[in-house]
Amino acid sequence: MASLKIPANIPLPEEDSEQLHKAFKGWGTNEGMIISILAHRNATQRSFIRAVYAANYNKDLLKELDGELSGDFERVVMLWTLDPTERDAYLANESTKLFTKNIWVLVEIACTRPSLEFFKTKQAYHVRYKTSLEEDVAYHTSGNIRKLLVPLVSTFRYDGNADEVNVKLARSEAKTLHKKITEKAYTDEDLIRILTTRSKAQINATLNHFKDKFGSSINKFLKEDSNDDYVQLLKTAIKCLTYPEKYFEKVLRRAINRMGTDEWALTRVVTTRAEVDLERIKEEYLRRNSVPLDRAIANDTSGDYKDMLLALLGHDHA
């Protein structure tokens, strides 16, 4: 469930564009106006605002925001204003760069987005960067990491649903996974094939059979080798495919509780999940930490950056 709060009576894109244009004029930028508009519009509405702004003022709204804002506030507003597939393309490209290398983000995008949305992200990536995501991932990774990541970003995974699950296949592949993991054959082709090609519904059925038959979840079996980067990547993919809200809760917990806030992780999760399932993530965060997420963020951030995050969380005032 989305956390985004949209007012009952939405102004026309022309009105929103005019107010944003006014927010950029004068001696200082009206950050509050920017938050009050953009943080309360969905992706379609933000896209209309960008189009109307360009038509009326012959300027790119994103470039205007880039010129007027700075720091973490600029990043959260810019990421939020992008179309979701544009945003994911940008984050995926950023995650392959040597100076910001974060391959976990690639797994996150590949495994938590619906298949059609991820396909459109790859199209947006090609348009923006004149190369394919698959090519960039292959170029910027090596060894076992590449062996897992390239299939993850290459496959068009059928989303599937519970009534389409092949129970016999789930039982068989649960045994295959158990055999490979107990043998520590983590890079085995069958293991990678199962995790990168099966529908999410089929994988969930397989992993449920795994737990029922062998007494623990697959990630518990992988825990003893969790210091290995490849195994961590494997665990991340499994968590993203099966319990995305638990995965994102952990990212947020680490971003907030570490020595010094990880603003990039915090910004990424809030902007990418506010229109998807941030309410469920908030519930999981409260269950896990006994503190509401909005309060934790309010205590760990400040200024316009804090206000924008809280607005996207559905709590303009914490």
Swiss-Prot record:
Which residues does Ca(2+) 3 bind? T301
Which GO BP terms apply?
A: response to cold; response to heat; response to red or far red light; response to salt stress; response to water deprivation
Q: Which InterPro entries match?
A: Annexin, Annexin_repeat, Annexin_repeat_CS, Annexin_sf, AnnexinD_plant
Gene3D superfamilies, sorted? Annexin (1.10.220.10)
Annexin repeats span which residues?
11-82, 83-154, 168-239, 243-314
Q: Which residues carry this modification: Phosphothreonine?
A: T100, T112
- The question of whether Calcium is a record keyword is answered with yes
In which tissues has expression of this protein been reported? Answer: Expressed in flowers.
Which residues are annotated as modified residue Phosphoserine in the UniProt record? S95, S290
Note the superkingdom of the native organism: Eukaryota
Sorted alphabetically, which Pfam families does this protein's record hold? Answer: Annexin
On induction, the UniProt comment says:
Up-regulated by heat shock, dehydration and salt stresses.
Sorted UniProt keywords: Acetylation, Annexin, Calcium, Calcium/phospholipid-binding, Metal-binding, Phosphoprotein, Repeat
DNA repair is among the record's keywords: no
Residues that bind Ca(2+) 1? F24, G26, G28, E68
Query: Sites of the modification Phosphotyrosine?
Result: Y129, Y285
N-acetylalanine occurs at: A2
Residue sites binding Ca(2+) 2 per the record: I256, R258, G260, D300
UniProt GO MF annotations: calcium ion binding; calcium-dependent phospholipid binding
Q: What is known of its domains?
A: A pair of annexin repeats may form one binding site for calcium and phospholipid.
The family annotation for this protein states:
Belongs to the annexin (TC 1.A.31.1) family.
Question: What is the recorded name of this protein?
Answer: Annexin D6
Please give the organism: Arabidopsis thaliana (Mouse-ear cress)
- Phylogenetic lineage: Eukaryota, Viridiplantae, Streptophyta, Embryophyta, Tracheophyta
